[in-house]
C-alpha cells in the first residue's frame, strides 16, 4: 500500500529528526556531590580574583559568594534537556522570580565535566585586559565565560546536566543577575571584601555575603 508506506516513512523521519538528545539521555540532573562541587569551585575561583591572587587582575572589594538556587537550576536543566548545545534564548533565561539570567555552557566527557567546565571557563582570564574590569566589552578574544563567572553582583546560581549514551555531558549554568553588560564594571577595584553590604563570607575569605 503506497499510502501506508508513505505514512510510515514520514513518521520514521519525524522520529529521527525530532529525537534530539532527549531520547539518548543517560543521566539527567546533578546529585548532591555535583551540586556542592559546581558551587565550591566557582567560589574558589572568585576568591582568587577577589584577593588579588590572579596575575594581571585587580582585587575586588565587592565580589559576592555564590549560592545554589533550585529555581534557577530547574530552568538550566530544561535548557540542557532540549538537546540543543547552544546558548539558551534570552526569552527563556528567566523564571517567575528572576527576569534575566546569565549563562555558561560546556560540553565534555563524563564523569568529570564539572571541574573541566569551571577550569575551562576560568582559563579565559588570560585574555582579559585589565581595562575590561572597569568597563566590560566583548570585542577581541572570547572571555565571556570567565567574566560571567566572576561578575561581582552575581549571587544565586543553578546548573543543569545531561549526559548522553555517547558519554558526552552537557552542562548549563545560569546566574542572577546576568553579567557581561557592555560598559559596566565586572567588579569594583579595591582591597578584598572592603565594600561588603551584608558582611564578609566566613567560608570564602575575600568574598561578601
From Swiss-Prot:
GO terms for cellular component: extracellular region. The keyword Disulfide bond applies. GO terms for molecular function: calcium channel regulator activity; toxin activity. InterPro entries: Allrgn_V5/Tpx1_CS, CAP_dom, CAP_sf, CRISP-related, V5_allergen-like. May act as a voltage-gated calcium channel inhibitor. Belongs to the CRISP family. Venom allergen 5-like subfamily. This is Scoloptoxin SSD346. It comes from Scolopendra dehaani. The lineage of its organism: Eukaryota, Metazoa, Ecdysozoa, Arthropoda, Myriapoda.
Amino acid at each position: 500500500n503506497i499510502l501506508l508506506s508513505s505514512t510510515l516513512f514520514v513518521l520514521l523521519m519525524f522520529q529521527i529528526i525530532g529525537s534530539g538528545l532527549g531520547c539518548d539521555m543517560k543521566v539527567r540532573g546533578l546529585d548532591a556531590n555535583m551540586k556542592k562541587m559546581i558551587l565550591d569551585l566557582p567560589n574558589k575561583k572568585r576568591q582568587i580574583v577577589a584577593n588579588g591572587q590572579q596575575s594581571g587582575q585587580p582585587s575586588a572589594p565587592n565580589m559576592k559568594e555564590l549560592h545554589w538556587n533550585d529555581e534557577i537550576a530547574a530552568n538550566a536543566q530544561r535548557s540542557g534537556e532540549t538537546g540543543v548545545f547552544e546558548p539558551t534564548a534570552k526569552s527563556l533565561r528567566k523564571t517567575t522570580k528572576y527576569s534575566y539570567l546569565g549563562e555558561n555552557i560546556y560540553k565534555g566527557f563524563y564523569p568529570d565535566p564539572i571541574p573541566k567546565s569551571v577550569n575551562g571557563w576560568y582559563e579565559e582570564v588570560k585574555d582579559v585586559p585589565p581595562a575590561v574590569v572597569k568597563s566590560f566589552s566583548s570585542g577581541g578574544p572570547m572571555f565571556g565565560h570567565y567574566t560571567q563567572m566572576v561578575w561581582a553582583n552575581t549571587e544565586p546560581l543553578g546548573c543543569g546536566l545531561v549526559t548522553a549514551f555517547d558519554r558526552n555531558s552537557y552542562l548549563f549554568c545560569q546566574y542572577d543577575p546576568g553579567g557581561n553588560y557592555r560598559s559596566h564594571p565586572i567588579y569594583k577595584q579595591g582591597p578584598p571584601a572592603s565594600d561588603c553590604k551584608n558582611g564578609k563570607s566566613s567560608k570564602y575569605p575575600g568574598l561578601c555575603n
